[in-house]
Amino acid sequence: MNWITNYVRPKINSMLGRREMPENLWIKDPSTGEMVFHKDLESNQFVIPSSGHHMRIKAKDRLRFFFDNGEYTTLEAPKVPLDPLKFRDEKKYIDRLKDYRSRTGMDDAIVNGLGTIEGLPIVATVQDFSFMGGSLGMGAGEAIIQGFEKAIELKRPFVLFASSGGARMQEGILSLMQLPRTTVAVEMLKEAGLPYIVVLTNPTTGGVTASYAMLGDIHIAEPGALIGFAGPRVIEQTIREKLPEGFQSSEYLMEHGMVDMVVSRLELKATIARLLKIMTKQPANSDAPAPQKPDADSKAA
């Protein structure tokens, strides 16, 4: 009877048993509630086909979609002290870091990539919101500076995709130090005469908007992105007034002159390639989609 109980019965159970469905097989559209098949979403760069809603995207996926043929080289993340303040809230900061590293496979919230877009060599830096809300700490700050320095070394244009909740509170003043440090790196790039394009994605808030994310030569925003220093709820509680509808959205900011254009993720590569070719005085691709421009009333404002 042992072979029946040990082999036959488990085999039958495995054949007849209910197969578990992966949790991430279907993705819910936050704007409409529609369920979208994961593979359909990924093939569309994580933009909902029906509504155009831009889902958050992992850094490595962002680079894969952005670079020619999905090919790029990443820079090794700089080594920094993990927890110099020995900070603890609900759990030790160092344990929280280890948890996020295990879940994301990343050292910190920044990934630097080297590759080409439409044949033009560039350096691209991506902030990943899935790693502690894309917060800016020593590791992230050092990686951003590394990206700027590599662009200067190779004499390449620099593109940064911002997505962050702001400074990393667990690192205190050491986190805030990254604001002036990254600002200096921006100035170094500009002194080298190299283009700097910033893509503001959802969300880009806090100290990031008080430093490198708003210092680009050109600022592009993805549709529907939340962009601002403090969140709308905090502002309403402070001034005790209701904010205008769509306040701090990418479209609102473009209408009021805070960003240069709002571009769908599906058109970002072609748009940025055309802009960089113009900025570096190379022949531009006439087939690239034209950027969205503010109307006359917006210009007057």
Curated annotation (Swiss-Prot):
The keyword Signal does not apply. Keywords: ATP-binding, Cytoplasm, Fatty acid biosynthesis, Fatty acid metabolism, Lipid biosynthesis, Lipid metabolism, Nucleotide-binding, Transferase. It holds the Pfam family Carboxyl_trans. Pathway: Lipid metabolism; malonyl-CoA biosynthesis; malonyl-CoA from acetyl-CoA: step 1/1. Its EC number is 2.1.3.15. GO terms for biological process: fatty acid biosynthetic process; malonyl-CoA biosynthetic process. Its main location: cytoplasm. GO terms for cellular component: acetate CoA-transferase complex. Acetyl-CoA carboxylase is a heterohexamer composed of biotin carboxyl carrier protein (AccB), biotin carboxylase (AccC) and two subunits each of ACCase subunit alpha (AccA) and ACCase subunit beta (AccD). This is Acetyl-coenzyme A carboxylase carboxyl transferase subunit beta. It comes from Brucella abortus (strain 2308). The gene is accD.
